[in-house]
Structure formats: C-alpha cells, structure tokens
Design a protein with these regions (language model features):
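Hydrophobic alpha-helical transmembrane segments
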Residues: 31-36, 79-84, 109-110, 148-153, ...
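Transmembrane alpha-helical segments in multi-pass inner-membrane proteins
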Residues: 213-246
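Helix-loop-helix "hairpin" substructures at the membrane interface of multi-pass membrane proteins
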Residues: 148-217
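Transmembrane helix-bundle core of multi-pass membrane transporters
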Residues: 24-29, 108-167
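Short loop segments and helix-boundary regions at transmembrane helix junctions
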Residues: 46-128, 224-237
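Structural signature of hydrophobic alpha-helical transmembrane segments
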Residues: 27-38, 76-86, 152, 202-216
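Short juxtamembrane and helix-loop transition motifs at transmembrane-helix boundaries
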Residues: 18-25, 39-50, 67-77, 168-178, ...
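Membrane-interfacial amphipathic/re-entrant helices at transmembrane-helix boundaries
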Residues: 2-39
Length: 246
C-alpha cells in the first residue's frame, strides 16, 4: 500500500504543531515536573497503599494547603514554609500510628481537617484567594525552576532508594514486625518513606493541586495490584501507569 504524499505532509504538520507547544518554557517545565512527580508518587504509593496509608497523600496535601495559605498571608516563600511543615506533619502521622493509640486513618483525618480549616480561615482574612486556587486545583503556569530542580532531586532519591534498598523496603512494607526481628531498622525506612512522600506532595501540589495529588498515589498502585501479584511487578506497572496517565 502506497501512502499519499499529502497524507504524510499532513501527519508531519500535526507532529510539528505538537512539538511547537514545547517552545514555551512553562509547558516544558510542567511536563518534566509532572512526569517526575507521577513517577515518585507511584513508587511511594505502592508501599503506602500496602501499609494502609493510602490517604496520607490527601492528608499531607491539606496540611500543605494550610501552610501555603499562611505563607501567602505573611508574604513568605511558599516552598520554604510548606516543605518543613509537611515533613513535620508526616513524622507526626508516622509517630501517632506507630504508638497505636490512634489509628492511622483517624490521625490523617484529624490532621487533614484541621489544616484545611486553618487554611480556609487564613484565606478568608486575606486577599490571596487567586493564588490559593492554583494550589487547590493546580496550575501549569505556577511551575518555577526551583520546582523543576526539587522534582529532579526527589525523583533521583526515590529511584536510588528503591534500587539500593528494595529488599528492606519490601520487608518493611509487608511485615514490619518480622523485619524488626531480622535486624532491619524499620523506623529508619519508614522515616525515609515519610520524608520522600512529603517532598512529592509539596511539589505535586503546584501542578496537580491539593485536591488531586492523592490520586497519583492511590490509583496507579491499585490498578497495578489488579493486574500483577508480585511487589516488583506492581511497582514497575504503577510507575508506567502513572506516567502514561499524566
């Protein structure tokens, strides 16, 4: 079958038009940051879902929203305020759930609703509603070079961690008590997962928004678990599904 030259020319024109989009810097940054955040969220999401911390992304994103509202009201740099606040919140959730006095889902709901309420109160008293909408629903225009650098660093750390400490993460994810008995420092690896999750949430809020960032953690992992049964296969499939879906 011979393809008509006009058909080839039309296809080439469409390809050129698609590539011309990336001449805009903000679109290129949005694509790179989105793919890297999707990759990080998918890899971390497998462990979080299996450890029954599926809603930690939603909880930390609401904490980040509250921190961003306060930073905007005080005219402070958003990332410099939100990153340490979300990291501390992740450690608090990890500590509360490990004590066993409050279940993990209850702790997430408590912290999430409180932070969201604080953010709403702060916004109502300031004139930063426009900026806050970009954090609630995401905005590709809000991606800066700092976000790009942070997303690259975060993705490299996550990938290296999964490659080097795959067996220990596997043990901590499925049976934390057994991993402690075998000498694995489960607290250290849980802390690392919490730290990386907090960084991923903060960066992802810029492009996905506080209301949708948790979907990058939950949906790819759950979809992969319907297809594969091994931890390695689920992790790889989750990363592919997340990047393609974005």
């Amino acid at each position: 079958t011979v393809i008509a030259p006009a058909t080839i020319t039309q296809a080439q024109r469409r390809l050129v038009k698609m590539l011309e989009i990336f001449q805009y810097g903000f679109l290129l940054r949005a694509l790179v940051v989105g793919l890297l955040v999707s990759l990080c969220a998918a890899l971390l999401g497998v462990s979080l879902v299996l450890k029954r911390f599926s809603m930690i992304g939603d909880g930390l994103s609401h904490v980040g929203f509250g921190a961003l509202a306060i930073a905007s009201a005080l005219n402070l740099a958003p990332l410099q305020v939100s990153i340490p606040v979300v990291i501390v919140a992740a450690f608090i959730l990890l500590r509360i759930s490990s004590d066993g006095k409050i279940k993990g889902d209850a702790a997430i709901a408590l912290l999430s609703s409180s932070a969201l309420a604080i953010g709403a109160i702060v916004i109502s008293q300031t004139n930063s509603a426009t900026d806050m909408n970009s954090y609630m629903f995401g905005s590709i225009m809000a991606i800066s070079n700092d976000d790009l650098v942070l997303s690259i660093i975060c993705s490299v750390i996550v990938i290296v961690m999964f490659v080097l400490f795959y067996n220990k993460i596997f043990a901590v994810t499925f049976d934390e008590n057994f991993s402690k008995a075998t000498g694995v420092k489960s607290g250290v690896y849980n802390t690392i997962i919490a730290l990386l999750t907090a960084l991923t949430i903060v960066v992802g809020m810029r492009i996905m928004g506080a209301l949708l960032i948790s979907s990058l953690i939950i949906f790819p992992a759950l979809t992969s678990m319907r297809v594969f049964t091994s931890f390695r296969s689920v992790t790889i499939c989750s990363a592919v599904v997340s990047c393609v879906s974005y």
